[in-house]
């Protein structure tokens, strides 16, 4: 019996300006293809059905207005995470050459993964991650994608707020030139994280379109560029190895120089051994850093929303945006890891900023870097919140039109829950380590590959074609990384130690 024919609109866009062809293409509908009612598509502006003048305006019916540059800022900011603080630690446990190889491999794989997403979305006319899941596997696929996005991004937002909770009191303490932490409310991280969430994060999260956050994204990236410049600068001003009593100095730079001179006379033999970079390292923690590297370029839930809001969108243009964003973050990641590692070598801690406190807790430059990092992670939270809100819309309100009340309530509810987790959960990093180890491989490797395999018509690419075989291998790689990550975390818990080097 012949399969029914389905008319699909190729590359539909909300502003109708796409130039890659809008003619209907008649393709046989395979048994695994599904069409969801347009009314059930994403209510946060992430699908791209054409505007119909005969119907009541739908809030997906807006023109993409985000420029190429703003889109690069938004996607780069989505890629950048708190993991950049742990990459020097990862390099210390892999060596420079192995680190560079892993970082390059992950960057290329992330670009390939985005290519699969864009190609799948172009075939079926969908620009929502969850809707691709529906098209490939029906409601279970849609819910699985929405759940993975929700877990991954809640974990990411929690790690950002955790940084605010731990770092902001130290910044205030340094500004006030206090030797010890006081019991005042403005030195309490719990109060501070709530204050930042209400006054900065929530207003940005209430914006209706991601494009407007391009300005805050640009500022956030500027903060991380400043962090990188400071790391490079400090490489040439921090002695190696660090004197044993360096963490007792409190801003007396003449004393620091005297100690530096004395120690250099005493530890010349040890310095040559300790202060020599390793190019290839394999130890008990090397494998533990691989998941950190693998998840350094997580941005896939944000790719399709940014694609939707792009001015004059096309697959080629969005792929260029993705490649440029990945390339920028690749360079920043490598330089931050390299100069952070070459500053402290094997003495680097899992969070790079903590290591600098050994040199001088009241260093003005490091204080400014802390402020820059806090600013960057604060401005990243609203961008990460957008796909979570969209996923919740997909799961709970699939047939509802846009409502400002629901838009606000979901944002407030999410921030409230995340603040409660950050404040009351003592082992939050371990909890979200598991979440990241399970959801990230699905979002980066497994879902894009299997969605592509199911959605791409067999008439265009047979099941045994090279692209589909590569996609299946890509999915298998994701399962392998997920198994490795979970195994390392379980071993970590069983041994009662913590060796986390960072988190996206």
Curated annotation (Swiss-Prot):
GO terms for cellular component: apical plasma membrane; basolateral plasma membrane; plasma membrane. It comes from the Eukaryota. Belongs to the amino acid/polyamine transporter 2 family. Changing residue 387 to Q: In DEE102; uncertain significance. GO terms for molecular function: amino acid transmembrane transporter activity; L-alanine transmembrane transporter activity; L-asparagine transmembrane transporter activity; L-asparagine, sodium:proton antiporter activity; L-glutamine transmembrane transporter activity; L-glutamine, sodium:proton antiporter activity; L-histidine transmembrane transporter activity; L-histidine, sodium:proton antiporter activity. It comes from Homo sapiens. PANTHER family: AMINO ACID TRANSPORTER (PTHR22950), SODIUM-COUPLED NEUTRAL AMINO ACID TRANSPORTER 3 (PTHR22950:SF22). Glycans are attached at residues 74, 247-248, 252, 323. Its main location: membrane. The record marks 77 as: Modulates L-glutamine-induced conductances and Na(+) binding. It is found in: Cell membrane; Basolateral cell membrane. Symporter that cotransports specific neutral amino acids and sodium ions, coupled to an H(+) antiporter activity. Mainly participates in the glutamate-GABA-glutamine cycle in brain where it transports L-glutamine from astrocytes in the intercellular space for the replenishment of both neurotransmitters glutamate and gamma-aminobutyric acid (GABA) in neurons and also functions as the major influx transporter in ganglion cells mediating the uptake of glutamine. The transport activity is specific for L-glutamine, L-histidine and L-asparagine. This is Sodium-coupled neutral amino acid transporter 3. Pfam families: Aa_trans (PF01490). It is a multi-pass membrane protein. It catalyses: L-glutamine(out) + Na(+)(out) + H(+)(in) = L-glutamine(in) + Na(+)(in) + H(+)(out); L-asparagine(out) + Na(+)(out) + H(+)(in) = L-asparagine(in) + Na(+)(in) + H(+)(out); L-histidine(out) + Na(+)(out) + H(+)(in) = L-histidine(in) + Na(+)(in) + H(+)(out). Keywords: Amino-acid transport, Antiport, Cell membrane, Disease variant, Disulfide bond, Epilepsy, Glycoprotein, Intellectual disability, Ion transport, Membrane, Sodium, Sodium transport, Symport, Transmembrane, Transmembrane helix, Transport. InterPro entries: AA_transpt_TM (IPR013057). Disulfide bonds join 240-275. The chain crosses the membrane at residues 83-103, 106-126, 144-164, 187-207, 213-233, 324-344, 366-386, 408-428, 431-451, 471-491.
């Amino acid at each position: 019996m012949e399969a029914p024919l389905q008319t699909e609109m190729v590359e539909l866009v909300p502003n109708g300006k796409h130039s890659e062809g809008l003619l209907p293409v008649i393709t046989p509908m395979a048994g695994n293809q599904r069409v969801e009612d347009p009314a059930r598509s994403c209510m946060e502006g992430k699908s791209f059905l054409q505007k119909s003048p005969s119907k009541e305006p739908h809030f997906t019916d807006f023109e993409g207005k985000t420029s190429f540059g703003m889109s690069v800022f938004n996607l780069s900011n989505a890629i950048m995470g708190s993991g950049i603080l742990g990459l020097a630690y990862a390099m210390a446990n892999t060596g420079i050459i192995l680190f560079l190889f892993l970082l390059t491999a992950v960057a290329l794989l992330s670009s390939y993964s985005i290519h699969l997403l864009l190609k799948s979305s172009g075939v079926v006319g969908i620009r929502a991650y969850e809707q691709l899941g529906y098209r490939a596997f029906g409601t279970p696929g849609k819910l699985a994608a929405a759940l993975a996005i929700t877990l991954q991004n809640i974990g990411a937002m929690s790690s950002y707020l955790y940084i605010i909770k731990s770092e902001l009191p130290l910044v205030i303490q340094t500004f006030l030139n206090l030797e010890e932490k006081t019991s005042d409310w403005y030195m309490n991280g719990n109060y501070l994280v709530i204050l930042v969430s209400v006054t900065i994060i929530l207003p940005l999260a209430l914006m209706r379109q991601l494009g407007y956050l391009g300005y805050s994204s640009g500022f956030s990236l500027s903060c991380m560029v400043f962090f990188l410049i400071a790391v490079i600068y400090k490489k040439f001003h921090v002695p190696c190895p660090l004197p044993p009593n360096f963490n007792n100095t409190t801003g007396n730079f003449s004393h620091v120089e005297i100690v530096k001179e004395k120690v250099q006379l005493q530890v010349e033999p040890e310095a040559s051994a300790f202060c020599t970079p390793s190019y290839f390292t394999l130890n008990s923690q090397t494998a533990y850093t691989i998941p950190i590297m693998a998840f350094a370029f997580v941005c896939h839930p944000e790719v399709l929303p940014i694609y939707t809001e792009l001015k004059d969108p096309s697959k080629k243009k969005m792929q260029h945006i993705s490649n440029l964003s990945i390339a920028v973050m690749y360079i920043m990641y490598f330089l931050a890891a390299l100069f952070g590692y070459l500053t402290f070598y094997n003495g680097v801690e899992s969070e790079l900023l903590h290591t600098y406190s050994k040199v001088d807790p009241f260093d003005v430059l490091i204080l400014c870097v802390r402020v820059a990092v806090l600013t960057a992670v604060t401005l990243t939270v609203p961008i990460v919140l957008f796909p979570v809100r969209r996923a919740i819309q997909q799961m709970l309100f699939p047939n509802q039109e846009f409502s400002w009340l629901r838009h606000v309530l979901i944002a407030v509810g999410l921030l409230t829950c995340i603040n409660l987790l950050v404040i009351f959960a003592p082992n939050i990093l371990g909890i979200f380590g598991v979440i990241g180890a399970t959801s990230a491989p699905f979002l980066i490797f497994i879902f894009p590959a299997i969605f592509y395999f199911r959605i791409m018509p067999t008439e265009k690419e047979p099941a045994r074609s090279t692209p589909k075989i590569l996609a299946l291998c890509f999915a298998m790689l994701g399962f392998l990384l997920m198994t490795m990550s979970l195994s390392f975390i379980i071993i970590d818990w069983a041994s009662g130690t913590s060796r986390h080097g960072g988190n996206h």
